[in-house]
Amino acid sequence: MSNVTHQPKIGFVSLGCPKNLVDSERILTELRTEGYDVVPRYDDADMVIVNTCGFIDSAVQESLEAIGEALNENGKVIVTGCLGAKEDQIREVHPKVLEITGPHSYEQVLQHVHHYVPKPKHNPFLSLVPEQGVKLTPRHYAYLKISEGCNHRCTFCIIPSMRGDLVSRPIGDVLSEAKRLVDAGVKEILVISQDTSAYGVDVKHRTGFHNGEPVKTSMVSLCEQLSKLGVWTRLHYVYPYPHVDDVIPLMAEGKILPYLDIPLQHASPRILKLMKRPGSVDRQLARIKQWREICPELTLRSTFIVGFPGETEEDFQMLLDFLKEARLDRVGCFKYSPVEGAGANELPDQVPEEVKEERWNRFMQLQQQISAERLQEKVGREILVIVDEVDEEGAIGRSMADAPEIDGAVYLNGETNVKPGDIVRVKVENADEYDLWGSRV
């Protein structure tokens, strides 16, 4: 007599930032552990989960469209993620959604799945789920989320209203996860959160334990511990608090990657105040100079907003002057977009769309020139490159200065004798505004 039973199948759509991706990985890991199959097609699935983003209006629209598509193609849909914090907004457009939960509501999502698609008979000891869990990234790099939520109340952002105040993960749990990832073949760990440099603030930097050893719950201690794993460690979403200075020597010593992703947002003191952002431009420029003196290889990435309510031509010019002085390596720029529930919506002197567009173009033109000059300095030098893709034409990878998906690439034309995850030494032969070309040494 056969014991084979139907294995329930779940479809999954993951939208938004790397932090959302980590939430998706956690839900998928739990589902696979319980014996559910995860399928890539709506019509094969018994139910679909949509993990949404709600950060800006375009993300809300994309999430609503994804929910609509899942409903049309399948009919049984559970919604989670940031937009899930605004249940009324979803129900107004899609009343047939079965259940809605907010972000990081893993247990609720699983309970809803159990209700509509009961758990299969399953022996967890025969599970094929890898020890590091289900990952949605290539196997040689992974995101490591160290905290949830944020204590800032920036006027352009609604993340705290969706994800709550800062909650740091126990440092022992974070380090154990990092060790599992490395044991599974991960060569690069990308540390993420809403506010990485605030890690441990909510628990007063209490002492945790890892492998029986006491470890302080702080960004610097975390970096010191991660450096012992022998893989690339990259820091994202680092607010420029004073103690950030303490990680620069670790970068200079080669313990973690010489890469800082610091969201500065603007350079006009008046606009920063309207944004409820900290920061003195002169102080920030002095720190950047000091950081580069300690760690000459340091790559600085940042993001900025142009066209924020009240931004004058004088304010914008301050931003351009800052770019010229700071000469940042990697920069993203967004035109201010009103987000429902954000305090900035109530500010006077909203900037016309055509002015936002014009300022964005001027900003990008200047930064492209700076980026091209910075990359040109690397021509003729030897750098380390982690390989991401290989085909018959060659390999594509990233240097220590490049995070996946948001930064540039290094092209190794004709280099086919490598595989994803390999770290190779490359001589840089050419550069443009964003990317490098070179040959393996």
UniProtKB/Swiss-Prot annotation:
Return the similarity comment. Answer: Belongs to the methylthiotransferase family. RimO subfamily.
Which InterPro entries does the protein's record reference? Elp3/MiaA/NifB-like_rSAM, Methylthiotransferase, Methylthiotransferase_CS, Methylthiotransferase_N, Methylthiotransferase_N_sf, NA-bd_OB-fold, Ribosomal_uS12_MeSTrfase_RimO, rSAM
Q: What is this protein called?
A: Ribosomal protein uS12 methylthiotransferase RimO
A molecular-function term among this protein's GO annotations: aspartic acid methylthiotransferase activity
SMART domains, alphabetized? Elp3
Keyword Transferase recorded: yes
Q: Which GO terms describe its biological process?
A: tRNA modification
Q: How is the cofactor bound?
A: Binds 2 [4Fe-4S] clusters. One cluster is coordinated with 3 cysteines and an exchangeable S-adenosyl-L-methionine.
User: Which cofactors, if any, are listed as required?
Assistant: [4Fe-4S] cluster
Q: Which residues bind [4Fe-4S] cluster 2?
A: C150, C154, C157
What keywords sit in the KW lines? 4Fe-4S, Cytoplasm, Iron, Iron-sulfur, Metal-binding, S-adenosyl-L-methionine, Transferase
Location of the TRAM domain: 376-441
Listed under GO cellular component are: cytosol
Catalytic activity of the protein: L-aspartate(89)-[ribosomal protein uS12]-hydrogen + (sulfur carrier)-SH + AH2 + 2 S-adenosyl-L-methionine = 3-methylsulfanyl-L-aspartate(89)-[ribosomal protein uS12]-hydrogen + (sulfur carrier)-H + 5'-deoxyadenosine + L-methionine + A + S-adenosyl-L-homocysteine + 2 H(+)
- Tell me which NCBIfam families the record gives: 30S ribosomal protein S12 methylthiotransferase RimO, MiaB/RimO family radical SAM methylthiotransferase
| Protein purpose | Catalyzes the methylthiolation of an aspartic acid residue of ribosomal protein uS12.
Q: What is its EC number?
A: 2.8.4.4
Query: Origin, by domain of life?
Result: Bacteria
Which residues does the UniProt record annotate as the domain Radical SAM core? Answer: 136-373
| Top EC class of this enzyme | transferase
Question: Which residues of the sequence carry a binding annotation for [4Fe-4S] cluster 1?
Answer: C17, C53, C82
